[in-house]
C-alpha cells in the first residue's frame, strides 16, 4: 500500500539547498547498535535541515526518534531516490538484495569492520555526502546472482545474492559429492566441503578467504571456488557472467545440505537436487564519492604495501 508524504518533493522556487538529483532519501541501519543509532540520528537531523524528505527503515526508526517517517524496506525502494545504509558490509548486502529491484541509488556509511561497500566515514560524513547530494559521485552497476534449488524437475526455492551463493553441508562440516556443469556442459565431478559461486562484488569476501582471485567490480564474470577439494589439481575458475552454473548433488550424500545466499538466506538441499546459479535480472546501483579508487580501497582494507617511489 502506498504512502503519502506531505514533504516528499520540494516546491518549485522553494528556498532549499537540495540538488535536482535526489529529493527523498531513505535511511537504513544496523538495529540495536549504539554507533549506528548515533550516526542515523545525525544523518536524519542533517538531511532534514537541508530540506530533504527522509524516510527511516522501520527496524531502526524508533531509535532515531518518534518524529520519523517509519516505513519498510520495500517502501524505501519504491519511494526514495537515494538509500543511505549505515553499518557494515553485511547490512549493505541485506538492503541491496531488496533495493536492487528498484531504480534507487545506494551509498553506505561504514559502521562495520572492513567496509568494502560502505565508503563514508561515520564521524565526518557531511562534507563527502554534501558533494554526492550535489551530483558529484561515481556510479557502479553491480550485478546479483539468482540461486535456485530444483527437485525432480520442479523449482523448490530461490533467492538472490550480491556476494555469493554457496553450496555447503548443514550444521556439521563434511565432504559432499556433486557435479558441475557450465551452460549444460559437464566440467567436473567434485568431492569437497562445498562450492562458492561469487560475483566480482563477492570476490573480496568468502571467495577470497577460500583462495579465489579478486575480480574488479566492472568485470562481467563469476568465479567458482571449490571449498577444501579432495584433490590437488582443482583450482578456482572464472567464467562469463552470463553463464548458467548447475551443481548436481549426488544422491549418495547426507540430507543436511544448504545453499546460502550472502550467508543470510539458506535454501534446503536434498540428495539428487540440482542447484542453478545464474545472473539475476536485478542490478544494484552503488554510488561513491567522486574520485573513488577501487585499488586504494583494496590497498587500505587488505593491508597491501604503499608506493615505494
From Swiss-Prot:
Catalytic activity: NAD(+) + ATP = ADP + NADP(+) + H(+)
Physiological role: Involved in the regulation of the intracellular balance of NAD and NADP, and is a key enzyme in the biosynthesis of NADP. Catalyzes specifically the phosphorylation on 2'-hydroxyl of the adenosine moiety of NAD to yield NADP.
Keywords on record: ATP-binding, Cytoplasm, Kinase, NAD, NADP, Nucleotide-binding, Transferase
Highest taxon, organism lineage: Bacteria
Active site: 89 (proton acceptor)
Residues engaged in binding NAD(+): 89-90, 163-164, 174, 191, 193, 204-209
Enzyme class at the top of the EC tree: transferase
Names of the cofactor(s): a divalent metal cation
GO molecular function: ATP binding; metal ion binding; NAD binding; NAD+ kinase activity
Gene label: nadK
Protein name (record): NAD kinase
Record PANTHER family: NAD KINASE (PTHR20275:SF0)
Family statement drawn from the similarity comment of this UniProt entry: Belongs to the NAD kinase family.
SUPFAM superfamilies reported for this sequence: NAD kinase/diacylglycerol kinase-like
Gene Ontology annotations for the cellular component aspect, listed alphabetically: cytoplasm
Predominant location: cytoplasm
GO aspect biological process, one term: NADP biosynthetic process
Cellular compartment(s): Cytoplasm
Gene3D superfamilies, A to Z: Probable inorganic polyphosphate/atp-NAD kinase, domain 1 (3.40.50.10330), Probable inorganic polyphosphate/atp-NAD kinase, domain 2 (2.60.200.30)
Keyword S-adenosyl-L-methionine found: no
Pfam families hit by this protein: NAD_kinase, NAD_kinase_C
Amino acid at each position: 500500500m502506498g504512502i503519502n508524504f506531505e514533504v516528499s518533493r520540494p516546491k518549485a522556487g522553494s528556498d532549499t539547498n537540495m540538488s535536482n538529483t535526489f529529493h527523498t532519501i531513505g535511511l537504513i541501519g544496523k538495529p540495536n547498535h549504539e554507533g549506528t543509532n548515533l550516526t542515523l540520528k545525525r544523518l536524519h537531523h542533517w538531511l532534514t535541515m537541508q530540506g530533504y524528505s527522509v524516510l527511516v527503515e522501520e527496524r531502526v526508526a524508533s531509535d532515531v526518534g518518534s518524529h520519523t517517517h517509519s516505513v519498510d524496506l520495500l517502501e524505501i525502494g519504491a519511494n526514495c531516490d537515494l538509500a543511505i545504509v549505515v553499518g557494515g558490509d553485511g547490512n549493505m548486502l541485506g538492503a541491496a538484495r531488496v533495493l536492487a529491484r528498484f531504480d534507487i541509488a545506494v551509498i553506505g556509511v561504514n559502521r562495520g569492520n572492513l567496509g568494502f561497500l560502505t565508503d563514508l566515514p561515520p564521524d565526518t560524513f557531511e562534507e563527502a555526502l554534501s558533494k554526492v547530494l550535489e551530483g558529484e559521485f561515481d556510479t557502479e552497476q553491480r550485478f546479483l546472482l539468482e540461486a535456485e534449488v530444483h527437485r525432480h524437475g520442479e523449482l523448490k526455492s530461490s533467492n538472490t545474492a550480491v556476494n555469493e551463493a554457496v553450496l555447503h553441508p548443514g550444521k556439521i562440516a563434511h565432504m559432499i559429492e556433486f557435479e558441475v556443469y557450465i551452460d549444460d556442459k559437464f566440467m567436473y565431478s567434485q568431492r569437497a566441503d562445498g562450492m562458492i559461486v561469487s560475483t566480482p562484488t563477492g570476490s573480496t569476501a568468502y571467495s577470497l578467504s577460500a583462495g579465489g582471485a579478486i575480480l574488479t567490480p566492472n568485470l562481467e564474470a563469476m568465479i567458482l571456488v571449490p571449498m577444501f577439494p579432495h584433490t590437488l589439481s582443482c583450482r578456482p575458475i572464472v567464467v562469463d557472467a552470463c553463464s548458467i552454473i548447475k551443481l548436481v548433488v549426488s544422491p549418495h550424500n547426507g540430507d543436511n545440505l544448504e545453499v546460502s545466499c550472502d550467508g543470510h538466506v539458506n535454501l534446503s538441499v536434498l540428495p539428487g537436487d540440482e542447484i542453478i546459479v545464474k545472473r539475476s535480472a536485478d542490478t544494484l546501483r552503488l554510488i561513491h564519492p567522486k574520485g573513488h579508487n577501487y585499488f586504494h580501497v583494496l590497498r587500505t582494507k587488505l593491508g597491501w604495501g604503499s608506493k615505494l617511489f
